[in-house]
Amino acid sequence: METPSETSFPKGNFSSENPQVGGLTQSSTISNGYHEPFVVEPIASSHTHTIILLHGRGSNGPKFVLFPSTKWIFPTAKKRRAVLFKRMPINQWFDIYDINNQTYREHLQVDGLQETTAYLHGLIEQEIKNGIPVERIVVGGLSQGCAASLYAMLCYNKRLGGYVGMCGWLPFAKYMEDCLEASQNKDDTEDDDIFGGSDDEESTTFEKEEELDDTQATVAKNPITEAIGFLKDNISFPRSPKKEKIDVLETPMFLGHGVLDEKVLFRLGEQARDVLKGLGCRITWKAYDDLGHWYKIPDEIDHIRDFISDSLELEATS
């Protein structure tokens, strides 16, 4: 069981007397229940990129500096009542009863995922308004922050600069698998022409219109479109206009997971990886044999640094 304060990044030196230390801004409560994020302003004079990372369940915002011209944003989840902990309010992006058996009481996740997705999209849009191109914005998170940010990213309509997830999972992955598997089963039988068909080479105008309708229906029922559509429907977000290409799936992604993780089982990380591959995503996957529920130091930090450097063509500090 993941207790309510185990999955955080390293903490900065924050106190009420010391609201800003080394470019890190302390959070304050705002009206919608969220706190202002901890923000690490760029060390360099120019602000060229932004990275937004979500903490794990029961934790709060961190300190994590690698790239001098990059602004780091560490949001803190609002307090939500956790059914698993006798409805005790804890910082969590969404409620969940059993991480390793997500189909049990899965409805608990929906409201939080809806709010968190809207919140993260708002942070992204604010950075775009601040002049940062969307292709220079990276999102991600640790543990439940990985799960929430992954779900939110897949519901976004634009390609991002990158995604970084550590020891997390994909909420409602089983339904995504079902969408993709249903299409595979259809592909296995669609070549069987049980009605024989016609040998006529000419098509009537009606037949051509019917073929066009079939093509449009294929786009509408594309398994990838349907899988992403399910995620949006699940949280009452509008579906994107029907088209063959879903821009956000072009986002390069990094996923890392400890093989010995007992809080978020390794197989859940593998499941997320496989679903994302099924969606056509570009995945950098790292498994850490001797790691539990955390991130690997220095290996995983180095891997993330290299991934961000390659994806955004950024030079990292040593």
What are these regions (language model features)?
Residues 4-24, 29-136:
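Serine-hydrolase catalytic machinery in alpha/beta-hydrolase-like enzymes
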Residues 42-45, 168-316:
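The feature captures the conserved acid-bearing segment of alpha/beta-hydrolase catalytic domains
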Residues 55-57, 137-143, 258:
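Conserved alpha/beta-hydrolase "nucleophile elbow" surrounding the catalytic nucleophile
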Residues 67-69, 136, 160, 250, ...:
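A generic structural signal for alpha->beta connector loops
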Residues 72-74, 163, 285-287:
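Conserved beta-strand scaffold positions in the cores of enzyme catalytic domains, especially
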Residues 75-76, 164-167, 256:
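Alpha/beta-hydrolase-fold catalytic nucleophile elbow
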Residues 128-192:
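Primarily recognizes the serine-hydrolase "nucleophile elbow" in alpha/beta-hydrolase
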